[in-house]
Amino acid sequence: MHIESPIKRRQSTRIYVGNVPIGDGAPIAVQSMTNTRTTDVDATVAQIKSLEKVGADIVRVSVPTMDAAEAFKVIKQQVSVPLVADIHFDYRIALQVAEYGVDCLRINPGNIGNEQRIRSVVDCARDKNIPIRIGVNGGSLEKDIQAKYKEPTAEALLESAMRHVDILDRLNFDQFKVSVKASDVFLAVDSYRLLAKQIAQPLHLGITEAGGARAGSVKSAVGLGMLLSEGIGDTLRISLAADPVEEIKVGFDILKSLRIRSRGINFIACPTCSRQEFDVIATVNELEQRLEDLITPMDVSLIGCVVNGPGEAEVSHMGIAGSNRKSAFYEDGVRQKERFDNDNIVDQLEAKIRAKAAMLSKENQIDINQID
């Protein structure tokens, strides 16, 4: 029930990764990457399905060898979410997975080889209508660019990206997106800002090697939040040294916080103090776990007392304002006659939220695959 995002998205061209639209106003796609051995087909398929379950629009899979390429063929047959093959060093692997129905090829300009090899990949991608991601990384720039700039800079990342954008332009290939990732927030942000002014193609956002679950989430939220608030970005990945499922959750939380794209429940909860009349922290944690399966966008406020409780509840789909023994319950901003027992709020509120989610119009849900 909160206001729509004031962010004006950067205008970009449109590509498709499988059936997922990227750019030109399409919802920002959230993706992750498997961390299993790709040759372990069962483990990789299981992880992809777990990512899809929490909302992943696209999943990237590392394909470091020809054996991994053969495994990719089997994996692709067992999942429905679009797959990006992550290719480094050996361009021939890209040609191989293209035969196996890959939905997008990620190549690293710093190690994929000379222009002739890139031409081979582009020709294959064009023939099979496969988009490419030019994935520049501050830790693996071309040797001549490293020598020129001495250290990763925004200008260095931009030069690497534009070098390969120019190659694709010369080859008359426009089905690509670009990323210029760095582990330093300001370096990444400055690089993306420069790139956004240079090209019209979609941009894939990320703070690479951001760190563990807590610190990496914060670093990613700061960096990507800066860019997204400026309208920059068409797809994103949160790079965490953690379960990839967490990357998807954090990605959606960032988009939800900026009101760019909502999926599931947006909990507004107080940090608690001695005025709380029910256990807010335990209630939030339990409801988050129980309601992970819901995709309907909803705002639910859980405030432990009457100081801010009524005000937050009045601008939420549902809200609780803590009171002695029984707390006030609000729906669509209106206080209801029904009150919730403070010792049983979780069960009561879960039932109300599920019923409300079932009633909300499907027009409020974003199906990224149905965007024209």
From Swiss-Prot:
Q: Pfam families, alphabetically?
A: GcpE
**Protein's UniProt keywords contain Iron:** yes
Q: What is its EC number?
A: 1.17.7.3
Which GO molecular function terms does the record list?
Answer: 4 iron, 4 sulfur cluster binding; 4-hydroxy-3-methylbut-2-en-1-yl diphosphate synthase activity (ferredoxin); 4-hydroxy-3-methylbut-2-enyl-diphosphate synthase activity (flavodoxin); iron ion binding
Sorted alphabetically, the keyword list is: 4Fe-4S, Iron, Iron-sulfur, Isoprene biosynthesis, Metal-binding, Oxidoreductase
**Which cystines does this chain contain?**
none
Q: How is the cofactor bound?
A: Binds 1 [4Fe-4S] cluster.
Q: From which residue to which does any coiled coil extend?
A: none
Which SUPFAM superfamilies does the UniProt record give? Dihydropteroate synthetase-like (SSF51717), Nitrite and sulphite reductase 4Fe-4S domain-like (SSF56014)
Indicate which residues the UniProt annotation says bind [4Fe-4S] cluster: 270, 273, 305, 312
User: Which domain of life does this protein belong to?
Assistant: Bacteria
Cofactors demanded by this protein: [4Fe-4S] cluster
Q: Fetch the InterPro entries from UniProt.
A: Dihydropteroate_synth-like_sf, IspG_bac, IspG_bac-typ, NO2/SO3_Rdtase_4Fe4S_sf
Catalysis: reaction(s)? (2E)-4-hydroxy-3-methylbut-2-enyl diphosphate + oxidized [flavodoxin] + H2O + 2 H(+) = 2-C-methyl-D-erythritol 2,4-cyclic diphosphate + reduced [flavodoxin]
The alphabetized list of GO BP terms reads: isopentenyl diphosphate biosynthetic process, methylerythritol 4-phosphate pathway; terpenoid biosynthetic process
Pathway this chain belongs to? Isoprenoid biosynthesis; isopentenyl diphosphate biosynthesis via DXP pathway; isopentenyl diphosphate from 1-deoxy-D-xylulose 5-phosphate: step 5/6
Q: What class of enzyme is it?
A: oxidoreductase
User: Gene3D superfamilies annotated for this entry?
Assistant: Dihydropteroate synthase-like, Sulfite Reductase Hemoprotein, domain 1
Functionally, this protein is described as follows: Converts 2C-methyl-D-erythritol 2,4-cyclodiphosphate (ME-2,4cPP) into 1-hydroxy-2-methyl-2-(E)-butenyl 4-diphosphate.
- Family per similarity comment: Belongs to the IspG family.
Recorded protein name is: 4-hydroxy-3-methylbut-2-en-1-yl diphosphate synthase (flavodoxin)
User: Which gene underlies this protein?
Assistant: ispG
